[in-house]
Amino acid sequence: MLFTEEQLKLYSKPLSESEKEKCENAIRIIQESLESLGYETKKGIHRNNEDTLSYQIKMTNPSKDYELSIFVKGSYATNTNVRQNSDVDIAVVKESEFFDKYREGKTRENYKFVSSNKPPYHFKDEVEEALIERFGRSEVRRGNKAIRINGNTYRKETDCVPCFRYRDYSNDYMDDPNNFIGGITIYSDKGERIINYPEQHINNSVIKNNNTNYKYKKMVRIIKEIRYQLIDSKNENAKQTSSFGVEGLFWNIPDYKYSNDEMLGDTFNALIAFLIDNIDKLREFKEPNDILNLCDSQEKNNVYKNFILDVKNYFEYSGEKKYE
């Protein structure tokens, strides 16, 4: 398909101010819901990073002596979302409890940690109860990993993700309780433990964007829009490639590749050319958090390979007008 510079310029723009307001409202309503359970706001709504939409709130429950961190994660947090009808992901993190990992021969006893006496799903039950009380049963739907809150003209459709902290002590050789790689652990209703690193993702996207003279996020928005177009045309590889995944592909491209050309289309072609040249090295790529592998299976590796080839065949650039 032939794309003009003006089209790409449109795709590369961040969402409107009204979308930002709805995103902010989504986190605020979760804050208000948890107040009914006795939580108090310790630090009001603020941005975790001024260059993102990663709104955050800190709450505490004096009677239970623990804190919550509530923050926007995913593509809204990194400001790379491209379709207005997509939902916003909000993590509700219980800071006082964490899942852990240690190097061989070490256990929590070496760090003088104690086990929680509550099952992981108890916290999700508590959050769900607060949301139902605030919105009513018909507006709240519990899923395997998240609790969905229906959207309206005031707020975005929201996936509220109750979770715990994660601490990886694998590289600590001093039994130092503060020496860990931190993330979050989502405990699903099916008993799965999902570990990810949303805060590193947010911060790394800001660094990458700054290092590429703000071209990185523009290019990510363009590839995400093209992915949606391929999905609309029934492309199976695009369907199996997540929004986070295509962002990860572009995050692994060296910064200097973003500065070769002034035109959006020329820059995009240069990035796709790099992926084609390195298509057999995708197993070495990292997620934008720079911790987990982007392709953790041969199946995913094959999907990403085919997606890259499909984008190359789909994207044609007419060339015109330099962007500001």
From Swiss-Prot:
GTP binds at K224, S243. Its EC number is 2.7.7.-. It is an enzyme of class 2 (transferase). Its cofactor is Mg(2+). CDD domains: NT_2-5OAS_ClassI-CCAase. SUPFAM superfamilies: Nucleotidyltransferase. Keywords: Antiviral defense, ATP-binding, GTP-binding, Host-virus interaction, Magnesium, Metal-binding, Nucleotide-binding, Nucleotidyltransferase, RNA-binding, Transferase. GO terms for molecular function: ATP binding; GTP binding; metal ion binding; nucleotidyltransferase activity; RNA binding. The keyword Nucleotidyltransferase applies. GO terms for biological process: defense response to virus. ATP binds at D89, N144, K145, D159. This is Cyclic GMP-AMP synthase CdnE03.
